[in-house]
């Protein structure tokens, strides 16, 4: 199953990216197909050569604010859907002028993803897309 790492403060607090990166590396064993980090309306993905947090942190120059209320990290292990940028987590939708309105991720496969895809007329090869319509 996938691995989720999150940091949340009651209000924006000083954020230590080095500590968060260290925790993300421990989460690598839960993924293997893609990684991602989301905060403050921005989402950064690592796929292919950057599909481990170790490589993602070294090769992907993702920037995080020093003061931030929430950060989500996700290491994806492929279940339904291809291992690609469209299925990487965290996922965002409801775009606003400055970033996404909603950001989320999940651990595991939705057991009724085929029924949801039919009901909402979405591609059932991409189970993460179904979340946008629930």
Regions inferred by a protein language model and the residue ranges of each:
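Conserved short alpha-helical segments that host acidic/polar catalytic motifs at enzyme active sites
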Residues: 1-134
